[in-house]
């Protein structure tokens, strides 16, 4: 007895030292409680205003129940509670719940919080308590056990559960609304909590009960050093193996539908005190304090987007800017990149295509073969065929045809391999579209010398081979002309006009098609034929009498299918981007079938980080949108093997080896024992003494 008393006295003295709580050596509250910043029924905010790791509470014991065992007997609906503050910081939202079970009994609690927006009701936090003392709110210290904390965002989430309350960081004037569902025994408490920062009072969307709260939120001080380096991130935010939704997408639930643990994508295994610290750390990182460590007293609307304390700078919408207006983008943003689309498809507003857009100013093109305009009232002509040389495989000629019964061949067009801005009067009247180009004037020089060697062609700009149609005379070769030269034949031109020829049956309307060449890293243009069935080359005007009209070209995707270059995607399969001149089919033959698409032949990995955006067939769903089913739980061979299937195989192999060794040892011991027994038997042979008769002399 005399030896125990000094030890008890020493333990009592150590437990009462300043700066410790309960003799555990863990620092206490960083500042005394502030009763001015307290919601009714809640705890002081200052107790949970820290940004360093603390382990004051006991840890959770396990996972939450997947399904609800029994429905609550009574539902209690509370009035909405709203608060408005002048400054930003951490705010503790406590629901106005009174009466926590009978005084001398235990109860179980199920706490769930939802974040409400105009289009979603997202569960953000879920926790279950068990064995709670009656008359006291559920908490890790007043309950016998509690489960892991399931989170709806992150990692890490910016909210934290404090017993049955919600710790929220606020910094903007945009109000946030939360819904709580707290089940205490057989009662289910439901209500709304609303909070905002800034302004002269509650916003116009605040409930009538909202009022200005005295005091203000608490801003946690910046901890010295790096105390979170020793804390594994898996403790406070890990993937939930039982999540049944799509990854990286918020889970929205219908109104009044209770959330289950499988509705939240992440789970935290840390105790409550550590989760409160990570919430304060997240707030400090998002608020971006000044150099002296002082946070600003107030944040303007949208401070987290474009203010001086923005945590994450807004990502520039390069792709969207290039899709909407190529001329309004900074030239540095539109730098050449590998995998850039080489042809831009646009039409004017008169087209039926949903992606048509009028051209603002004519832009220079890489190489365009233009044909002289033909007046519809002039003498009818027949299409002339122009065969470009092999080294100019990426050029094409513009063909102009008048819709008359007879046709006379017109002089072929002269292809130009040099870059020159198209003249204003070069467009064929009545074609229904204008010449468009997505190349910048600053990137394309006005004039360049004629190349003497074949220019390199890109994989995406290689034209599709065409099947020669019916011709009355052999075509004449096309010769490159000087820059800005007219496409009409001259006296010095080697091209001669073809003899007139008549073609029976109706002919196609005026069609003007120009193909361009583009070097890697630049953008070319290609005219698309009019979508009007009266002027389309494959429309009813070309089909023989009595044949069914071909279906109109279908839309092959969203706006990304017809957008300009700059997004790092390969060109789509569109026949209008091949730069081929449409020819009038023979009336005696059916219209030719639509040629197959050209697939890009770039090696894998050349498209860069935007390779996952490569379009796939419609029948195949994108791999990133496919729901990943839960991993099947491992069924161990024995109850004590719970690690992995490899452990089962290793255990079987080890058991087999040990069993074989044991059998060999037993057999060897038996063999040795048998030999030892045999030697004992023959070591002392039985000797018989025989009396010999005496010898006689």
From Swiss-Prot:
Disulfide bonds: none annotated. The keyword Signal applies. Residues 560-576 have a biased composition (Acidic residues). Glycans are attached at residues 104, 163, 435, 510. Residues 1-22 form the signal peptide. Residues 23-648 are virion surface. Coiled coil: none annotated. Residues 670-697 are intravirion. It is a single-pass type I membrane protein. Glycoprotein G is much larger in HSV-2 than in HSV-1. This is Envelope glycoprotein G. The gene is gG.
């Amino acid at each position: 007895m005399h030896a125990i008393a000094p030890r008890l006295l020493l333990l009592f003295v150590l437990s009462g030292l300043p700066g410790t709580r309960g003799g555990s050596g863990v620092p206490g509250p960083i500042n005394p409680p502030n009763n001015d910043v307290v919601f009714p029924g809640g705890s002081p905010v200052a107790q949970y205003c820290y940004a360093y790791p603390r382990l004051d509470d006991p840890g959770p014991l396990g996972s939450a129940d997947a399904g609800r065992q029994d429905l609550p007997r009574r539902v209690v609906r509370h009035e909405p509670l709203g608060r408005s503050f002048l400054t930003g910081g951490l705010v503790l939202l406590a629901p106005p719940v009174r009466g926590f079970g009978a005084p001398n009994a235990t109860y179980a609690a199920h706490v769930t919080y939802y974040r409400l927006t105009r289009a979603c009701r997202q569960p953000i936090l879920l926790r279950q308590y068990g064995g709670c003392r009656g008359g006291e709110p559920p908490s890790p210290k007043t309950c016998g056990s509690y489960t892991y904390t399931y989170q709806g965002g992150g990692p890490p989430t910016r909210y934290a559960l404090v017993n049955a309350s919600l710790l929220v960081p606020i910094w903007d004037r945009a109000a946030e609304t939360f819904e709580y569902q707290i089940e205490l025994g057989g009662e289910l408490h439901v209500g709304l909590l609303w909070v905002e920062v800034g302004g002269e009072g509650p916003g116009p969307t605040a409930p009538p009960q909202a009022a200005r709260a005295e005091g203000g939120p608490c801003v946690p001080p910046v901890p010295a050093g790096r105390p979170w380096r020793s804390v594994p991130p898996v403790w406070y935010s890990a993937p939930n193996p039982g999540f049944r939704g799509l990854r990286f997408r918020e889970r929205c639930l219908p109104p009044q539908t209770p959330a289950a643990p499988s509705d939240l994508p992440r789970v935290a295994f840390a105790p409550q005190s550590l989760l409160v610290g990570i919430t304060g750390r997240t707030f400090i990182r998002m608020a971006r304090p000044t150099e002296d460590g002082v946070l600003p007293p107030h944040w303007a609307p949208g401070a987290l987007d474009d203010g001086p304390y923005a945590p994450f700078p807004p990502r520039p919408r390069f792709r969207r800017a290039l899709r909407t207006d190529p001329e309004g983008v900074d030239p540095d943003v539109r730098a050449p990149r590998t995998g850039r689309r080489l042809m831009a498809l646009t039409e004017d507003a008169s087209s039926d295509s949903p992606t048509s857009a009028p051209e603002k100013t004519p832009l220079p093109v890489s190489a365009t073969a233009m044909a002289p305009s033909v007046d519809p009232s002039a003498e009818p002509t027949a299409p002339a065929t122009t065969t470009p040389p092999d080294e100019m495989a990426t050029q094409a000629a513009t063909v102009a045809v008048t819709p008359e019964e007879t046709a006379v061949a017109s002089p072929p067009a002269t292809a130009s391999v040099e870059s020159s801005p198209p003249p204003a009067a070069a467009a064929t009247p009545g074609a229904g579209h204008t010449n468009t180009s997505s190349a910048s004037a600053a990137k394309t020089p006005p004039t360049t010398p004629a190349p003497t060697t074949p220019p390199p062609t890109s994989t995406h700009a290689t034209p599709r081979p065409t099947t020669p149609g019916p011709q009355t005379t052999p075509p004449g070769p096309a010769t490159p002309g000087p820059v800005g030269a007219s496409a009409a034949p001259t006296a010095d031109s080697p091209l001669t006009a073809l003899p007139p020829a008549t073609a029976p049956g109706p002919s196609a309307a005026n069609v003007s098609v120009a193909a361009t060449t583009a070097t890697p890293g630049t953008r070319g243009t290609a005219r698309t034929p009019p979508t009007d069935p009266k002027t389309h080359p494959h429309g009813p005007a070309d089909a023989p009498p009595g044949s069914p009209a071909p279906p109109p070209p279908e839309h092959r995707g969203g706006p990304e299918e017809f957008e300009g270059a700059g997004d790092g995607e390969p060109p789509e399969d569109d026949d209008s981007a091949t730069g081929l001149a449409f020819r009038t089919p023979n009336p005696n033959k059916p219209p030719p079938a639509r040629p197959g698409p050209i697939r890009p032949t770039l090696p894998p990995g050349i498209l860069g980080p935007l390779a996952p955006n490569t379009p796939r067939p419609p029948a195949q769903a994108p791999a990133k949108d496919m729901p990943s089913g839960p991993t099947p739980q491992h069924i161990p061979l024995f109850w004590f093997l719970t690690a992995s299937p490899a452990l089962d195989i290793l255990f079987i192999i080890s058991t087999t080896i040990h069993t074989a060794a044991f059998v060999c040892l037993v057999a060897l011991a038996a063999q040795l024992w048998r030999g030892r027994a045999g030697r004992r038997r023959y070591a002392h042979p039985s000797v018989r003494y025989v009396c010999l008769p005496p010898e006689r002399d």
